[in-house]
Amino acid sequence: MLFRAMGYVIAAFYRFVHLHNYYDMKPVILEFCLSRGIKGTVILAEQGINATIAGSRQSIGEFFSFLDSDDRLRGMKYHESHSDREPFAKMKVRLKREVVRLGIDGFDCSLRGEYIDPRDWDEFVSSPDVHVIDTRNDYEVRLGRFKGAIDPGTSSFREFPEWARNWALDKERDTCVAMYCTGGIRCEKSTAFMRSLGFRNVYHLRGGILNYLETMRGDDSLWEGECFVFDDRIAVDRNVSPSEDIKCIKCAGEVDASDLRSVSKGNIMCWDCRLQA
């Protein structure tokens, strides 16, 4: 496979849409990706699609043209980033009960809150009346977050509903809440959950942290640190380039792509510290 100078094109996307035949879609999508050398993960559920894939510029373009053949997936917007090294080892298409697991059956994702565009985000969340909530896992938050954001301290997204219910106990339902995540899907679903609890003023960052960093590239912003990503890059910096300075949580030594297996469990540790754990 030939790649242009900037290397692999990485596309992250999702859509909440009813896919009654998602079981039948799996082999079709898998065969298409394998035939074009695309690698990554596509999650299919009755409530929609969630994916991050990587390949050549041509193959990624062909993939989205392929999605356009399905009216439900036509015009899919995606966040694009790049890597000089291959971000994924294989291509996987997984069937799930939820495209991102919140653990609540029959949950209405259409209740989502209002979008805030990246250029408007800093001003919006700087208001003392806005409660900014990071909906990601604790090990992601440790690498970086927006200044002043609330860290729920959850180890998985399934723990978020319990945290949110407890947090909401002493909050007025007209409290203004702004939420964010990596690419937009978790914060979109979590805003819907907050609205189901009765909160009326609920907002989320359009396209998540990745879209924010891409939009604000080179500008001063409220983002601090690195952004964890679920591929061999481990994290990206404020320029959306693969991070070169990821530290082990035990010894503060450098963690590289070969240590990714430890990151998958939320333990950002170098190999030596893993052996001693």
From Swiss-Prot:
EC number(s) reported in the record: 1.14.-.-
Active site (catalytic residues): C181 (cysteine persulfide intermediate)
Pfam families recorded: Rhodanese (PF00581), UPF0176_N (PF17773)
UniProt function note: Catalyzes oxygen-dependent 5-hydroxyuridine (ho5U) modification at position 34 in tRNAs.
Catalytic activity: uridine(34) in tRNA + AH2 + O2 = 5-hydroxyuridine(34) in tRNA + A + H2O
GO biological process: tRNA modification
Alphabetical UniProt keywords: Oxidoreductase, tRNA processing
Annotated organism of origin: Anaplasma marginale (strain St. Maries)
GO molecular function: oxidoreductase activity, acting on paired donors, with incorporation or reduction of molecular oxygen
Transmembrane domains' residue ranges: none
Keyword tRNA processing: yes
Gene3D superfamilies noted in UniProt: 3.30.70.100, Rhodanese-like domain
Protein name, as recorded: tRNA uridine(34) hydroxylase
Family, similarity comment: Belongs to the TrhO family.
Domain of life: Bacteria
Ranges of residues in domain Rhodanese: 126-221
